[in-house]
From Swiss-Prot:
EC category: isomerase
Gene Ontology process terms (BP): chaperone-mediated protein folding; detection of light stimulus involved in visual perception; regulation of calcium ion transport
Keyword Aminoacyl-tRNA synthetase recorded: no
Name of the protein in question: FK506-binding protein 59
Keywords for the protein's UniProt record, in alphabetical order: Isomerase, Repeat, Rotamase, Sensory transduction, TPR repeat, Vision
Organism this protein belongs to: Drosophila melanogaster (Fruit fly)
SMART domains listed in its UniProt record: TPR
Source domain of life: Eukaryota
PANTHER family, alphabetized: PEPTIDYLPROLYL ISOMERASE
GO cellular component: cytoplasm; inaD signaling complex
Known role: May have a role in phototransduction; inhibits or prevents Ca(2+) induced stimulation of the trpl ion channel.
Recorded GO MF terms: FK506 binding; peptidyl-prolyl cis-trans isomerase activity
EC number: 5.2.1.8
Length: 439
């Protein structure tokens, strides 16, 4: 039972800690970490009521999330790697007046012997797959975190296998870090950090430099990197719910301009992000307002072009559909959708789009050229189908001939024999019969 120097963790004598063996290093786990430890729990009379050692299996839990008794969260947060300690827990920091029958009686003071085996950082990845792992090195009690669009000031230091490849101060608007080379994993982590906090972030490839790596930093493909990040300061993001329709319209124009600036720099991802913010913040109570409609048409059209530039033709087509829902005779959207349909081999739809452009603009040479291309591709497709049917009939005829019983030779033996020309002719007739000829 504990008898040595005790540390009052709760400040009221409710949680007392006595170190039996000092741990190594200076780091301790923080809220959100997955902690692994061994414990033995006893009543004050020495009666053992539970032990992970008897199960020969470490106990794991998420620290600071209320998954264990209060004393456990408080005590474990102070332990270093390899440390052993006693933790004396008053009832109000354990199981209280109810206890936990039958092993723990009401109003019981408990004594735990703990051994810290290790911990994993907090998983900040969007899909909770461990791809962004944070360990807080220096905590902060300032409850200010960045939100979308807020000004951010930070210091970042990136390393790979112990080699530092970048170390710099950065300032940017949250959500636009890509513009100055901030990888996604760092920006995602910053959203969870308090001003003044320093954290170590382990980031897997999909939120770092991906399958391509980074030649400048000598980062190979699919590499996991590590960043030490300090959030120096941050502003306050836009509170959209407080905005009037006029203010929403003004902010939409700001985002639209940002999108255009990123487009000019060929930063398609950020351009799409800004254009999307533009259309999302537009006022919804003035649907008939021509200025709002004009901005919507422009942003959907610009997003479509960005997706085209990124070779994402399905998304580009969807954005063109949005434009045409607002303006059915929008020539740019029709032409662009025609290009998307042509690329994804929706030839009939592409032809229809380009022909509609010519109806609206009879002198549109670009659309006329695309019509010629569509018709040529449709003709090639038709010929391929004809050959396919011809091959099918030829194979069927050959199979029939192989299985036909021997017959006596006569002068009419050649009559009705299936030739390759017959197969082609039958294929053409079948196509016409099934109404699948494409013109």
């Amino acid at each position: 039972m504990p008898e040595g120097n005790k540390i009052d963790l709760s400040g009221d004598g409710g949680v007392l800690k006595e170190i039996l063996k000092e741990g190594t290093g200076t780091e301790t786990p923080h809220s959100g970490c997955t902690v692994s430890l061994h414990y033995t729990g006893r009543l004050v009379d020495g009666t053992e009521f539970d032990s992970s050692l008897s199960r020969n299996e470490p106990f794991e839990f998420s620290l600071g999330k209320g998954n264990v008794i209060k004393a456990f969260d408080m005590g474990v947060a102070t332990m270093k790697l390899g440390e052993r300690c006693f933790l004396t827990c008053a009832p109000n920091y354990a199981y209280g007046a109810a206890g936990s029958p039958p092993a723990i009686p009401p109003d019981a003071t408990l004594i735990f012997e703990l051994e810290m085996l290790g911990w994993k950082g907090e998983d900040l990845s969007p899909n909770q797959d461990g791809s962004i792992d944070r360990t807080i090195l220096e905590a902060s009690d300032k409850k200010r975190t960045p939100s979308d669009g807020a000004f951010v000031k930070a210091h970042i230091s990136g390393s790979f296998e112990g080699r530092v490849f970048e170390d710099r101060d950065v300032e940017f608007d949250y959500g636009e870090g890509k513009a100055i080379g901030i990888i996604d994993g760092v920006e995602i982590a910053l959203e969870k950090m308090n001003v003044g906090e320093t954290s170590r972030i382990k980031i897997q490839a999909k939120y770092a430099f991906g399958a391509k790596g980074n030649e400048e930093f000598k980062i190979p493909p699919n590499a996991t990197v590590e960043y030490t990040v300090k959030l120096v300061d941050c502003g306050k993001g836009l509170e959209e719910w407080k905005l009037s329709d006029e203010e929403r319209l003004a902010e939409a124009k700001v985002y639209k301009e940002k999108g255009t600036n990123y487009f000019k720099k060929e930063n398609w991802a950020l351009a799409i992000k800004m254009y999307t913010k533009c259309k999302n913040i537009l006022p919804t109570t003035v649907h008939t307002n021509e200025e709002v409609k004009k901005i919507k048409v422009a942003t959907h059209s610009n997003i479509a072009l960005c997706h085209q530039k990124s070779n994402d033709h399905f998304e580009a087509k969807q954005e063109c559909n949005e434009v045409l829902a607002l303006d059915k005779n929008n020539v740019k959207a029709l032409y662009r959708r025609g290009q998307c349909n042509l690329t994804i081999n929706e030839l009939e739809d592409a032809l229809e789009d380009f022909q509609k452009v010519i109806q609206l603009e009879p002198g549109n040479k670009a659309a006329a050229n695309q019509v010629i291309i569509c018709k040529q591709k449709l003709k090639e497709s038709k010929n391929k189908e004809k050959k396919l049917y011809a091959n099918m009939f030829t194979k069927l005829a050959a199979n029939d001939k192989e299985t036909e019983p021997p017959r006596e030779t006569d002068v009419l033996s050649k009559c009705g024999e299936w030739s390759e020309e017959d197969a082609k002719r039958e294929a053409e007739l079948t196509l016409e019969r099934d109404n699948i000829i494409m013109i």
